[in-house]
């Protein structure tokens, strides 16, 4: 039990809780390009939002997703 707790805590520490929600296209049938934080790949990825419902892991731009979810862009210099 403790090992599982620490593994989950390590992955999610410091990340906005909304960013840990699963991608949710919503119930409507529109196709609005949006971005969500994929906690498996640790990147913001595009998806087609249906236009209603869904959840808070839904960003209009990739830049907004990266800012809110703390994702470093590939162009950022790495810390030593």
From Swiss-Prot:
Feature type site, description Reactive bond: 29-30
Localization terms from the record: Secreted; Nematocyst
Position of the signal peptide: 1-14
Task of the protein: Serine protease inhibitor that inhibits both tissue and plasma kallikreins. Has hemolytic activity. Inhibits voltage-gated potassium channels (Kv).
Superkingdom of source: Eukaryota
Ranges for domain BPTI/Kunitz inhibitor: 19-69
Pfam families named in the record: Kunitz_BPTI
Keyword field: Disulfide bond, Ion channel impairing toxin, Nematocyst, Potassium channel impairing toxin, Protease inhibitor, Secreted, Serine protease inhibitor, Signal, Toxin, Voltage-gated potassium channel impairing toxin
Cross-referenced Gene3D superfamilies: Pancreatic trypsin inhibitor Kunitz domain
Protein name: U-actitoxin-Avd3s
Disulfide bond residue pairs: 19-69, 28-52, 44-65
Molecular-function GO terms, alphabetical: potassium channel regulator activity; serine-type endopeptidase inhibitor activity; toxin activity
Propeptide intervals in chain numbering: 74-80
Family: Belongs to the venom Kunitz-type family. Sea anemone type 2 potassium channel toxin subfamily.
Gene Ontology cellular component list: extracellular space; nematocyst
């Amino acid at each position: 039990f403790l090992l599982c707790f620490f593994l989950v805590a390590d992955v999610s520490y410091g990340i906005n809780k909304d960013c840990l929600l699963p991608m949710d296209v919503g119930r409507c049938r529109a196709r609005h390009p949006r971005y969500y934080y994929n906690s498996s790949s640790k990147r913001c990825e595009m998806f087609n939002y249906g236009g209603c419902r869904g959840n808070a892991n839904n960003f209009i731009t990739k830049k907004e997703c990266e800012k809110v979810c703390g994702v470093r862009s590939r162009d950022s210099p790495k810390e030593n």
